[in-house]
Amino acid sequence: MIFSAAGAVLIAAVKRVVRIIRHLPKWATAVFWFVFTLPLPLQAHEFWIEPSSFQPDPDQSLTADLLIGTDFLGAPAIYVPDQIEKFVLLGSGAKSQSERYEISGRYGDRPAGKMTSGSPGLSIIVHQTAPIRLTYSDAKKFDEFAREKGFDDALVQHQDRGLPLSKITERYQRYAKSLIAVGGPEKIGAGRDRHLGLAIELVAEANPYQWPPLQSMPVRLYADGEPLANAQITVFTRHNPRHVEKAKYQTDRDGRSNFALLAGRDYLVDSVILRPMDGAIESSDAMWESIWASLTFQVPKNPKM
């Protein structure tokens, strides 16, 4: 499925917004982006990390946007400390504190992440949001979101639990990773992604930056530390800013899936778990919980020289 026309419209809209806010004072810009991004999860928008370079030099200054959008086209969120539980850069094979860089900022910063790329090898940018509670205005919006993410019977489950169809509440949390290849030609393909123990996590089981480029990417989905079988994974392939292709896959019994790669493209892999919250009828807590995983990387068109 290709999103050319829709992508062009969204890009034009975002550019118009950026032109407007460019002339606002910093505090007004921060407020605008905070308000602008609040309602986006209601339309099941993805959340992902996009670094300023997927292949930086060692110790290069680097930024990372936290993007909220759909079909790999989105608006950058601002840095809001209260909405962040984890924001780190993990160096290649990072097991010691010296190879772990905490990413911090000031309220309203955009891009939200500023860092130094660090030592050569495959590094991982990790972002975990704080839990956020939302309310769907009607059952149709909830059903559309659930079906898009592979939970066709969620609304039936909701009714079977005796819950109201108006003002359906959900608590959601996001877990995003981005893979970057740091260093010159001598480090092409060095390092690997790894399971970090996030509540939901996508792990690339091959290095996307190796040369010659990979023909396909094996990924594994984990939930609560265990491989997750029979789960939907959505892959967005960005050929250029106005040409994004979307495909859906299912994990096997070991939580694995595999999809084709093309050189010179950016990739966003997304998966969501939607599950009922226990005791939602008796308590004031949300009726549903969703946890989101995303993984971004690039497949190089030419070897880095």
Regions from the language model: what does each represent?
Residues 27-39:
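Bacterial N-terminal signal peptides
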Residues 40-44:
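Sec/Tat signal peptide C-region and signal peptidase I cleavage site
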Residues 45-63, 153-217, 222-227, 239-242, ...:
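Beta-strand-rich domain onsets/edges
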Residues 80-82, 226-237:
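Short, ordered, surface-exposed loop/turn motifs in non-cytosolic proteins
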Residues 86-95, 232-248:
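Short amphipathic beta-strand segments in non-cytosolic proteins
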Residues 109-113, 247, 251-265:
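Glycine-centered loop-to-beta-strand initiation motif
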Residues 121-132, 267-273:
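Short, aromatic- and glycine-rich surface loops/edge beta-strands on solvent-exposed regions
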Residues 130-138, 275-280:
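Short acidic/polar inter-strand loop motif in beta-rich domains
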